[in-house]
Structures are given as structure tokens and as C-alpha cells.
């Protein structure tokens, strides 16, 4: 969504395309620097982006059924406007390093393999986890969970992981999660 709003097509590349998160983020930071975009410009653009149609309703329905944590490789500085529109779900994500002038100079990961590490930490204190995602960086947590699903993933990932149920619609994902509970 940010690539479209900013008019920078190179930023369409995500972890759905590049499994190496550090490589992807360093490349993205270079693109932002090249275009003179700092945190302020990015936050202004993100504030204009609405959740995907059906996302808020899905989360609301899911939160009525079970506890929900969003584990994301986004950054706290980017997530807030969207989380507000989604009714402030719990989100665990990373942090950007930002210079006084607003230039993004780097990023700090919460921990290595944050999605898988978080799922394992939750399991270590007695929680059962159910996970869904669309990208390479979601596969570890999906496979480590009691149940795991692909949601609106790429054809290549679905082909490479045929053992994972894949869904395109929120209602179908909700029913699969409900069944796994």
C-alpha cells in the first residue's frame, strides 16, 4: 500500500518476494534515502491507508472468540495509525532508528526470527498458538503452531508448502481458526 501511495514501485518488494529480511530492509532504506523520504513523510502516507476490506470485522469477530496477537515485522512508528483503525489490537513489532532530522538510519529487530521466537515463547508459558500469514517470514511460526494457515499468500509459497491450508477470504480463515480452537 505504501508503494502505491508513494508512487515508488520498487517498494512493492516484500517478504513475500525476498525471504532475507535484513537484505530487504537495507534495500528499502536505500530506496527511501534515494527519494528523500523520512519518517514524517512515511507516517503521513501511512495515515491515509485504510485496512484491507473486512480486516477490522475479521479481527473483531476473532477477538470475541479468542485472544489475538499480531506479530509483525513492521515498525512501531508505522503501525500506530493502522492499529487505531483496527481497534488497537495487540501488536508485537520492531523499531526504527531515526535521526533528529527524521531520516531513518536503521532498524532494531525485537529479536532474531521474531515471529517464530514469539510463538515459541508463548508456547513455553503454556499457550497454544494458531498462526496465519502470507510471507516467507511467517512460515516458521505457522509450522511451529498447533495449527497454521496461509492467507492471501503468493502462488509460489502455496506451491512450495502444499501441506499448509491456504485461504483467500477472511470468513474461510475464521472458520479454520475456529475449528482449530
Which residues are covered by each model-predicted region?
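Short acidic-hydrophobic, aromatic-tinged amphipathic segments that line or gate anion-handling sites
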Residues: 92, 164-173
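Short, charged, surface-exposed secondary-structure boundary motifs
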Residues: 99-106, 158-165, 175-180
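Substrate-recognition "cap/lid" segment bordering the active-site pocket of phosphatases
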Residues: 77-129
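Glycine-rich phosphate-binding loop signature in dinucleotide/nucleotide-binding domains
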Residues: 64-66, 122-128, 180
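Alpha-helical segments flanking ligand/cofactor-binding loops in enzyme cores
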Residues: 60, 120, 139-140
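Short, well-ordered alpha-helical microsegments
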Residues: 76-80, 138-139, 174
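Acidic, Mg2+-coordinating phosphoryl-transfer loop and its flanking beta/alpha structural elements
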Residues: 68-73, 127-168
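Alpha-helical substrate-recognition element adjacent to the catalytic core
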Residues: 1-95
Amino acid at each position: 500500500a505504501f508503494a502505491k501511495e508513494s508512487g515508488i514501485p520498487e517498494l512493492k518488494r516484500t517478504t513475500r518476494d525476498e525471504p532475507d529480511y535484513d537484505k530487504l530492509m537495507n534495500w528499502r532504506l536505500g530506496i527511501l534515502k534515494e527519494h528523500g523520504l523520512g519518517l514524517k513523510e512515511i507516517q503521513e502516507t501511512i495515515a491515509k491507508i485504510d485496512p484491507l476490506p473486512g480486516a477490522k470485522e475479521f479481527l473483531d469477530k476473532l477477538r470475541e472468540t479468542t485472544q489475538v496477537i499480531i506479530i509483525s515485522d513492521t515498525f512501531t512508528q508505522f503501525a500506530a495509525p493502522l492499529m487505531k483503525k483496527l481497534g488497537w489490537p495487540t501488536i508485537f513489532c520492531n523499531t526504527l532508528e531515526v535521526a533528529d532530522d527524521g531520516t531513518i538510519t536503521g532498524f532494531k529487530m525485537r529479536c532474531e526470527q521474531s515471529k517464530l521466537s514469539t510463538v515459541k515463547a508463548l508456547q513455553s508459558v503454556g499457550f497454544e498458538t494458531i498462526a496465519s500469514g502470507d510471507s516467507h517470514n511467517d512460515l516458521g511460526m505457522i509450522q511451529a503452531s498447533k495449527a497454521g494457515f496461509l492467507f492471501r499468500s503468493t502462488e509460489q509459497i502455496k506451491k512450495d508448502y502444499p501441506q499448509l491450508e491456504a485461504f483467500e477470504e477472511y470468513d474461510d480463515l475464521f472458520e479454520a481458526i475456529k475449528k482449530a480452537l
